[in-house]
Structure formats: C-alpha cells, structure tokens
C-alpha cells in the first residue's frame, strides 16, 4: 500500500504540474508580445534621438532630417 500511495502522489504531482504549466503559457505569450513591441517602440524612439550635430531642422515641416537626407519644401528627401 505504501508503494501505491507513493505512485498515486507522484501521478498527482505530475498532473498538477502539467496543469499549472499549461495555464501559464498564455501569460508568457503576452509577455513575449509586449516585450517585442517595447523593443520595436524603443528602436523607433532611438532613431529620433540622434545627436543634434547630425541633424538639420527642416523649416518647411518642422522636423529633423537625418543625414544623408536633405530638406525640401515637401519634407525630408533622400535615401
């Protein structure tokens, strides 16, 4: 009976662990998506925070053109 109780407890522990791990998966996926979006947003913000010496302000649209772009009446142009 002692061995039977041990295997019963072991089986219950395995089933409980698998249930807990499956329930945690959707939360982990949302964390991964959120981290991915924050990296994308962070890289967008980083592109706009270049040093002032490497930017020229476009008077037509009041934005900064980063080299090798140049300012035209319609906005920043260049590669």
UniProtKB/Swiss-Prot annotation:
Expressed by the venom duct. Keywords: Disulfide bond, Hydroxylation, Secreted, Signal, Toxin. The modification 4-hydroxyproline is found at residues 59, 67-68, 73. Disulfide bonds join 58-66, 61-71, 65-76. Residues 25-52 form a propeptide. Residues 1-24 form the signal peptide. One of its GO terms (cellular component) is extracellular region. It is found in: Secreted. Its main location: secreted. This is Conotoxin ba-2281. It comes from Conus bayani.
